[in-house]
Amino acid sequence: MVRAKRTKRDSATNIYRTCKQAGTCPPDVINKVEQSTIADNILKYGSAGVFFGGLGISTGRGTGGTTGYVPLGEGTGVRVGSTPTVVRPALVPEVIGPADLLPVDTIAPVDPASSSIVPLTESSGVDLLPGEIETIAEVHPIPDVPTFDTPVVTTSKGSSAILEVAPEPTPPTRVRVSRTQYHNPAFHIITESTPSQGESSLSDEIIVASGAGGQSVGVSENIELQDLSNRYSFEIETPTPPRRSSTPLQRATQAFRQRSLTNRRLLQQVPVEDPLFLTQPSKLVRFAFENPAFEEEVTQVFEQDLAGFVEPPNRDFLDIAELGRPRFSETREGYVRLSRLGRRATIRTRAGTQIGAQVHFYKDLSSINTEAPIELDLLGQHSGDATIVHGTVESTFIDTNIEENPLAEQMELEIDTYPEAHSFDALLDEATDDFSGSQLVIGNRRSTTSYTVPRFESPRNSSYYVQDLQGYYVAYPESRDKIELIYPSPTLPAVVIHTEDSSGDFYLHPSLLQRRRRKRKYL
């Protein structure tokens, strides 16, 4: 059985117009239009017996009803908010209207029995110039009536009138400034009024200087003064144990945060050795473009589709959907630890809900140990005293004759005795060009072959050093232990066990799973 669709009835006003003449109106429509419902009857009969007018109930006027606001212990109050009386001006207003109408001479009606001949009459010309215009100006004097700003209070009831008397306005006060100067024989006061540059007004400058004409009365009292210590003489209290920061955090808050991150029952603890974890942890989750202007100091969300799954650069960050902001803490050994709280999205339901464990990634920063000092040599030792050397006083000049050379005869004897010692053959260039390994090319240049050598970007920052042969060379050897990977033989079952996973989960090879046998039903 199909239920009939309910149609909405027309409004009560339209139904009343059509059904009133036929007499088929429903009773609820008649009562609503003619205002004869139960609520309307209560208002009609109740208002005839009870009258609440003039009390100011739910009116929002704030007049206080008929009696007004009356202070405690006094008489009747003053009506507030009534219609004020308009104060009319004392001048006689002029009526503004049309000007007086001038009569116009009209021609008498023509009798049909009279003659149609119009007699000519002599008349003067028409005066086109205007006549004399009389101008009268009336001046109405203003009466000397004092006016006061007093509130006008009126009432429309039969109660007694109450007039509020305002105080008389106070006349403006005049201020007179006087200056009195007392003479003090111990001081000389000089008063000047000179304008300075950039000032728009004059100001009195008083200079107080001590004089020699004072007299000492009585015996001066010697007051013992206390010596104020130097600012470097205060003592600094060293707490026990010594503090590591200027404003240390409360131990309760620090311990609570440390316990919340190191709880192995709730969070998986994963240490990270890659230095990218300190500055750009997103490169450990996925391969992405590097933005040098972006600082990864906030919580990051990684969205990845199951169809486009990509192996992350670091296996520890597999299935990471959210990586929190960095947190700094202190370990028991006194090292600084950088922690980030992450969430894995290992399982995803059809409704879109992601299920995964929470992981605590951390990296401990080792302390900076002080190395042994290197002995340095002092350059330019001096006693600190300045020494001035005057060249013209301490130098010795010998006046020699350049024309007479006593060594000229000796040089001539040596040349004659040993001619090979002063031979000019040593100044000749005997180098010869050898073209035995050269090749002659005729024509254009040979085309050079270019090879592209791929360069892989290393996550670690490259370090460059310049060897100084004249100074000291300090070498810090660094040794790294490589992790030896032991692969199982093909005869053993392939079972992958993650030793770094503290949760105890494992992945079993599908070949080791028991096969389900099909159950057949025999008739």
From Swiss-Prot:
It is found in: Virion; Host nucleus; Host early endosome; Host Golgi apparatus. InterPro entries: Late_L2. Highly phosphorylated. The keyword Disulfide bond applies. GO terms for cellular component: host cell; host cell endosome; host cell Golgi apparatus; host cell nucleus; viral capsid. A motif (Nuclear localization signal) lies at residues 1-10, 514-522. GO terms for molecular function: DNA binding; structural molecule activity. One of its GO terms (biological process) is viral penetration into host nucleus. Pfam families: Late_protein_L2 (PF00513). Disulfide bonds join C19-C25. Minor protein of the capsid that localizes along the inner surface of the virion, within the central cavities beneath the L1 pentamers. Plays a role in capsid stabilization through interaction with the major capsid protein L1. Once the virion enters the host cell, L2 escorts the genomic DNA into the nucleus by promoting escape from the endosomal compartments and traffic through the host Golgi network. Interacts with major capsid protein L1. Interacts with E2; this interaction inhibits E2 transcriptional activity but not the DNA replication function E2. Interacts with host GADD45GIP1. Interacts with host HSPA8; this interaction is required for L2 nuclear translocation. Interacts with host importins KPNB2 and KPNB3. Forms a complex with importin alpha2-beta1 heterodimers via interaction with the importin alpha2 adapter. Interacts with host DYNLT1; this interaction is essential for virus intracellular transport during entry. This is Minor capsid protein L2. It comes from Human papillomavirus 24. The gene is L2.
